[in-house]
Design a protein with these regions (language model features):
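Helix-rich C-terminal or lid/interface subdomains of diverse kinases
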Residues: 200-250
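A cross-family kinase active-site recognition segment
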Residues: 93-145, 152, 161-162
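Catalytic-loop of the protein kinase fold
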Residues: 164-167, 172
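Active-site Asp-x-Gly
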Residues: 176-217
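A conserved alpha-helical element in kinase catalytic cores
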Residues: 40-80, 92-109
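A glycine-centered beta->alpha junction motif in the catalytic cores
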Residues: 81-95, 131-139, 222-238
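ATP-binding glycine-rich phosphate-binding loop
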Residues: 9-31
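Regulatory N- and C-terminal appendages and interdomain linkers associated
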Residues: 1-16, 148, 243-250
Length: 250
């Protein structure tokens, strides 16, 4: 149905202008019920959209500032690949203090989602120690040496508690800050994983030090290399993942 589905939000629902969006959606500002909102049209499955909608509603109820789904006139949270969500005011984080606030918000996200079910079709970084595919990741498409490096980085996360991670919070465009709150937007990459992946932030906003920072940075670079393979960005991220020392004969 495409954008014609916007009519399910009311006869006065209209598109306004395109917005920068995630990798999986056509994103526009829209007006629904006389209020500014955001419409995202993509090819995600109903199960995927239901997972995201339930997550955002849960986080909103628990006091996090997130875009929440606006129902259609008959009460659906999405229809024909279209989800309409509330518009978030604010600008991107710029200073170390801003990024510390982002880290605090991420840690609250992680606390609120311990034990959350995995996003349909996704796998965590530690799942990929054995599996080869999961949504946008296909390790079989990467050189074996690159896969070995990524898995070595993820192996350091084994045994850690899992929760929902935002998946791309170090992109300033995915955060909206005002004096009173921090809003996380663009949940395309959210899934269940180890929280370390969310905490490699500009200005080291999460204040990780020593081995904790190294583990998180290596695992995060490996994840972004795998999920984006094989464009220039993914190769830059792979270059940050340490090579595995060659075995030596004794």
């Amino acid at each position: 149905m495409g954008w014609e589905a916007l009519g399910l939000w009311g006869a006065d629902a209209v598109r306004i202008e395109p917005l920068a969006g995630g990798s999986s959606n056509d994103v526009w500002s829209v007006r629904v019920g006389g209020k500014l909102a955001v419409g995202r049209l993509g090819k995600r499955s109903d199960a995927d959209l239901a997972w995201e909608a339930e997550l955002l509603q849960h986080l909103d109820r628990e006091g996090l500032t997130v875009p929440v789904p606006i129902p259609t006139t008959d009460g659906r949270l999405f229809a024909d690949g279209l989800m309409v969500i509330t518009y978030m005011e604010g600008g991107p984080p710029r200073t170390k203090a801003d990024w510390r606030r982002v880290a605090e918000t991420l840690r609250e996200l992680h606390r609120l989602t311990r034990g959350w079910p995995q996003r349909p079709g996704w796998r965590s970084s530690t799942d990929l120690l054995d599996a080869e595919t999961g949504t946008r990741i296909d390790l079989a498409a990467m050189p074996p040496e690159a896969v070995a490096r990524c898995r070595a980085a993820w192996a350091r996360l084994v045994g850690r508690e899992r929760c929902v991670v935002h998946g791309n919070p170090n992109n300033p465009g995915n955060v909206r800050i005002t004096a009173g709150r921090v809003a996380l937007i663009d949940w395309d990459e959210a899934h269940v994983d180890v929280p370390d992946l969310d905490l490699v932030l500009p200005h080291n906003g999460a204040d990780l030090v020593g081995e904790a920072y190294d583990i998180a940075a290596q695992a995060s670079s490996a994840w972004e290399a795998a999920v984006c393979w094989d464009d220039d960005y993914s190769k830059e991220r792979l270059a940050e993942v340490r090579a595995i020392p060659a075995a030596t004969d004794r």
